[in-house]
């Protein structure tokens, strides 16, 4: 697209497709060299003034290049900040947190063992109380079961005693009667 192209080739039109479509190539060869140069110059002027594709492409490439460089620099800064933050955390915060955790963990472990021991004692007491309650409940249940049996036995004993007393009384009366009869018979 420069004016320094060789003149040995027939007219090399670098202009817009519109200009190229106006004249066929064969007609350009039949024209004179002055006309060819004018057409060539017009094509170059047209391409420089009206054809902005190369400029736009160049600007686009430049913008993309600058954008990628800035983006790369921004990403590098972000990565560098992350690396610094991680290094600081590893060097300062992590050891501090670890030591605090170890200190607190020891005290928490002691408290946990104490609580565990206390809970174990409470469970033992509850178990003993449950056994006593079960034993008392069993005794009360047994008493409740045996009370009617004992009352029944007492009633039967009283009935038997009453029958025995009545039988003894009858026997005494019988012996008294027999003794009277015997004494009557002896006196005869």
UniProtKB/Swiss-Prot annotation:
PANTHER family: BIOGENESIS OF LYSOSOME-RELATED ORGANELLES COMPLEX 1 SUBUNIT 5 (PTHR31784:SF2). One of its GO terms (cellular component) is BLOC-1 complex. Belongs to the BLOC1S5 family. Residues 10-19 have a biased composition (Polar residues). It comes from the Eukaryota. This is Biogenesis of lysosome-related organelles complex 1 subunit 5. Keywords: Coiled coil.
């Amino acid at each position: 697209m420069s004016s320094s192209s060789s003149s040995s080739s027939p007219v090399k039109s670098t202009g817009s497709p519109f200009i190229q479509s106006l004249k066929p190539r064969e007609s350009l060869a039949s024209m004179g060299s002055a006309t060819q140069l004018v057409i060539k110059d017009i094509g170059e002027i047209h391409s420089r003034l009206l054809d902005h594709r190369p400029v736009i492409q160049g600007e686009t490439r430049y913008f993309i290049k600058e954008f990628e460089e800035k983006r790369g620099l921004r990403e590098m800064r972000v990565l560098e900040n992350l690396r610094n933050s991680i290094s600081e955390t590893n060097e300062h915060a992590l050891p501090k947190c670890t030591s605090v955790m170890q200190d607190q963990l020891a005290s928490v472990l002691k408290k946990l063992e104490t609580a565990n021991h206390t809970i174990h004692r409470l469970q033992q007491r509850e178990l003993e109380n449950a056994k006593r309650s079960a034993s008392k409940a069993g005794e009360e249940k047994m008493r409740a079961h045996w009370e009617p049996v004992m009352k029944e036995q007492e009633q039967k004993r009283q009935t038997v005693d009453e029958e025995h007393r009545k039988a003894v009384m009858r026997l005494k009366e019988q012996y008294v009667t027999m003794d009277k009869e015997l004494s009557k018979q002896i006196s005869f």
